[in-house]
Amino acid sequence: MKPSPASTPVGSTLRISLVCNTAWAIYTYRQGLIRTLVARGVEVTVIAPRDRTFDLLAQMGCRCIDLPVASKGTNPRDDLRTLWALYRHYRAIRPHVVFHYTIKPNIYGSISAKLAGVASVAVTTGLGYVFIQSSRTAQIAKKLYRFAFRFPREIWFLNRDDMAAFTEQHLLVHPERARLLHGEGVDLEQFAPTPLPESNQVTFILIGRLLWDKGVGEYVDAARQLRARYRDVRFQLLGPVGVDNPSAISRDEVAAWEREGIIEYGGEAHDVRPFIAAADCVVLPSYREGVPRTLMEAAAMGRPIVATDVPGCREVVTDGINGLLCEAKSATSLAEKLAQMLDMSGAARREMGERGRQKVAAEFDERAVVERYTDLIRNLTGVSL
């Protein structure tokens, strides 16, 4: 079904809102979109829990509004607070289009937008615990998805597996509104190829929020196994710790791994490029993903990858071509693939990285993704950007 354009008076400023459970994710994954919208005169509002990226988003030209979201919680009162807060913001801002990301904004934001008479788009950035677990909470979340997803004008999925999961489990009342975005893209100029480090020591790095669901525990266990067999190898972690997520890893747990001498923790970084450039291989043993930005960035910079054979990761990695795929939730399988990478020659790793750059350039160019956004905005508002 093609939605009818929203009313946008000639000469008025186009207002677009981006809503997520972390401002960090908006800043990290959607800079290209924000720059394009701001440069074309759009009033961009980011609605998310306040964090240190609010200032950075403001510097880019965004208006930022704090949002109460209990990502870890299942208290209905907290969720109603989120729904009511979004409804009030939408009534006050009157955005022409709202894009929702992550579970709670997708569910409660879609409902709030409908109540406020605002056009919305749901972007499923990865299904997370809803499809990893079979708990009562996960079953309730699926029912909420089915109810809320009758309201967005379009529902975007980042990979075919997630789209198929929603379709097969009958969570889409209007399946004709589903679209495949195929990842959120990467800036190919910003993440340019760099040569592999010239060192006899091989460095692995896992970049992302430190969550058990990202396979951090398996990564640490695999590192522990391999350190007993290989001398010249380093295992690094980079990303926020103790985040508001049911699967969060604490700083104390990371500190214990550091004391044991298994891993090196680099903290957080706004710019991950120096860390990717200093690594020989990027690792992501996640249980499930949308299409992981980390892997797109790594491939764009010419790094071979070791990842799990799960939705999202296998969108970026073709086993044996630009990286290696291992079993999910298996430190043994991960250790085997990391050992295989260690036993390769530097030339073989370089060739894998070069093929990864070619794949990302062909399939994940951020410019094509931004064009999908601007095309939809035009269809919904009648305004060409």
Question: What does each of the following model-derived ranges do?
Answer:
Residues 304-307, 317:
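Short hydrophobic beta-strand element within catalytic cores of glycosyltransferases
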Residues 318-320, 324-331, 340-346:
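Conserved acidic donor-binding segment of nucleotide-sugar-dependent glycosyltransferases
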Residues 347-363, 369-375:
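A short, well-ordered alpha-helix in the C-terminal region of glycosyltransferases
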